[in-house]
Amino acid sequence: MIEKYYNWATLGTGVIANELAQALEARGQKLYSVANRTYDKGLEFATKYGIQKVYDHIDQVFEDPEVDIIYISTPHNTHISFLRKALANGKHVLCEKSITLNSTELREAIDLAETNHVVLAEAMTIFHMPIYRQLKTLVDSGKLGPLKMIQMNFGSYKEYDMTNRFFSRDLAGGALLDIGVYALSCIRWFMSEAPHNITSQVTFAPTGVDEQVGILLTNPANEMATVSLSLHAKQPKRATIAYDKGYIELFEYPRGQKAVITYTEDGHQDILEAGKTENALQYEVADMEEAVSGKTNHMYLNYTKDVMDIMTQLRQEWGFTYPEEEK
C-alpha cells in the first residue's frame, strides 16, 4: 500500500516520459503535471494520460509549490541546467541517464541537492530491478567466492544517419553516455570498490562522437572487467560475472529479470528469476518515493558518481568533448 502520494512532474514527453506515466498509473497514481518546450506537445501528452496541469513555460514546473518530484527525461546536454533550477527550488529529482555530461556537473548537482535537503538520483534501472538485489544477497553469502572477472556487451544497431541524436555531438550522443552507462553501472554493482585503473580503445563516427568502445577496468581488489560497446553493431545485452566458485550470466541486463548461476565444482546450475522487465519504471518510482519519504535511500548516487568519474576520465583521455564543455 502506498502511504503517501507524491506529485510527480515530467520534464519532457518522449518515450521514457510515457513509460513513467504508465508506471504511475500501474501503481494507482497519476502524473500531476507536464513541462515541455513545446506547449502543444505537452498538452497532447497531458490529454493522453489525464494530467491536470500543463505549463505555459517550461520554467514554471520548478516554481510550482505543488510539485514534489521532477523526472527529467530530456537529452543529456540539457540535464545540468534543469537540475540547477529544480534543486535550487527544493524539488526532488529523478534524472534520466546519463545524469550529467561529466563529473564536474554532477558534483555541482550533488552539492545543490545537499544544500537544499532534497533527493537527487539517476534513473538507472539496474539499481532497482529485483534480480540485482537477489544476486547481491547471493554474492554476499560467499557461496560464489570472491569476484574475479566481469564481461559486458552492449551493441545497438542504430541506422547510420548522422542526424540521429545517437550520433549527434550537439545532443551529447555517443556510445559511452547512451549505452555504456548501463554496462558500467552493472560493473559497479558487482565490484567491491570502484575501478582505479582504466584503459580503452575508441573509434569515432563521422560526427565525432564515440561509435565503438572497448574498456578494461581493474580495482584495488584486483577485480577486473571488460566492456564492449557499439552503436552500429548488434550484440546481445549479456553480462557474465565470474567468481572463484562459479559465474552468473545475466540476460538483457539493463532491465534484467533472469540470471543463470553455474557452479564451477560440479557444473550444476541454478536459475534465478525476479521482477519483470516491463515494470522497470515502477521499481524506480517506488525506490525514489522511499528515499523522498526519508525511510530508506536505495538510489545509489555513490555508484552513479563512480560511473560518471569513469566516463569523464575516458572522454578526457580520448580528447572528446561536447559543445557545452567548451564554453
Where do the model's predicted regions map?
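Rossmann-fold dehydrogenase core element
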Residues: 108-125, 146-148
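Contiguous beta-strand/loop segments that form the cofactor/metal-binding neighborhood of enzyme cores
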Residues: 185-256, 285-291, 295
